[in-house]
Amino acid sequence: MIDDTLLEAEEKMEKAIEVAKGDFGAIRTGRANAAMFHKIMVDYYGAPTPLQQLASFQIPEARSVLITPFDRAAMSEIEKALRNSDLGVNPGNDGNVIRIVLPQLTEERRKDYIKIARTKAEDARVSLRNVRRRAKEELDRIVKDGEAGEDEVGRAEKELEAVTKKHVDAIDELLKNKEAELLAV
């Protein structure tokens, strides 16, 4: 029972790390990458659809992206979604592909992205702490119901703290790397 609780907590913490990685990947740096477009939704025949499902991405140069829609009829909607996104890009359309040239990041914009990254990191830390709190409540319930002794649960709580610290450190490392990536000119 205790092992199940710890295993479940660790799995949820791993998922929180994966979400944080995805969030950090979506934050724009000076270089183009497909993850920047991860959260952009396109109004495709009246239904909000992720851009990844409607087009393929090519990155011919560090600051340019070619987006090739699978359905040419969706091209104008994809362009509109890109213009309305918070990426700050102006897509160009040549009839077959949508071409995006990413502008250089200004110092002010870099600082804004760092603030966003810190907010995402804090959200991930809160998520980890919530998982820890729920697991601790479950361990307390196990002791209260007499399913395990206090010593056994005490060891499990120490293990839970170690796992939580490991995952918080991983979030901090992701944030540090993202900040370094954003500050690199």
Swiss-Prot record:
<dbReference type="InterPro" id="IPR023584">
    <property type="entry name" value="Ribosome_recyc_fac_dom"/>
</dbReference>
<dbReference type="Pfam" id="PF01765">
    <property type="entry name" value="RRF"/>
</dbReference>
<comment type="similarity">
    <text>Belongs to the RRF family.</text>
</comment>
<comment type="function">
    <text>Responsible for the release of ribosomes from messenger RNA at the termination of protein biosynthesis. May increase the efficiency of translation by recycling ribosomes from one round of translation to another.</text>
</comment>
<dbReference type="GO" id="GO:0005737">
    <property type="term" value="C:cytoplasm"/>
</dbReference>
<protein>
    <recommendedName>
        <fullName>Ribosome-recycling factor</fullName>
    </recommendedName>
</protein>
<keyword id="KW-0963">Cytoplasm</keyword>
<dbReference type="InterPro" id="IPR036191">
    <property type="entry name" value="RRF_sf"/>
</dbReference>
<dbReference type="GO" id="GO:0006415">
    <property type="term" value="P:translational termination"/>
</dbReference>
<keyword id="KW-0648">Protein biosynthesis</keyword>
<dbReference type="InterPro" id="IPR002661">
    <property type="entry name" value="Ribosome_recyc_fac"/>
</dbReference>
<dbReference type="GO" id="GO:0043023">
    <property type="term" value="F:ribosomal large subunit binding"/>
</dbReference>
